[in-house]
């Protein structure tokens, strides 16, 4: 109950101090800025709730994020944009799942302590992402892919809807 009181105090302070705090635009901006972290936090919630720790989350995000433009800009994806879009979303998710499986094997099968196992990929994953990108910012343009980050449904950011949907699924799954 203490957290709810703290949240209520923060909301009340923001309402009092910030003139436009309660409008849809502010909510949309906050949702778009927080959604990625919220989605990652959902996964971490499951790890922590089960008594584990995962230091490799940021590195896994970096590897998946580095892989998406590589897949999308490949010859196959350029010749078939629909397939490229699907592959640039699904393949990085699969690679992220395989990274998690690697950590799981280290912990569950080989008996490595979770903090050590995930620290291994924390360090190596950042290196893998650097190698994949040659240390450069990767960019590409596709209206459908861009829509995931900048689009709106009913005035609310798409990534906010995705985070909300995943939150509901996780909340249902842990009940």
Regions found by a protein language model. Name each.
Residues 10-81, 105-115:
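Single transmembrane alpha-helix segments in multi-pass membrane proteins
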Residues 78-122:
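Alpha-helical transmembrane segments within multi-pass membrane transporters and channels
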Residues 46-47, 78-86, 133-143:
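A cytosolic-side transmembrane-helix exit/cap motif
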Residues 6-22, 50, 129-133, 170-175:
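Structural signal for alpha-helical transmembrane segments and their membrane-water exit/capping regions
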Residues 1, 24-32, 79-90, 147-161:
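Interfacial loop-to-helix junctions that mark the boundaries of transmembrane helices
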Residues 4-5, 30, 38, 59-63, ...:
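Hydrophobic alpha-helical transmembrane segments
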Residues 110, 114-175:
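Transmembrane helix-bundle core of multi-pass membrane transporters
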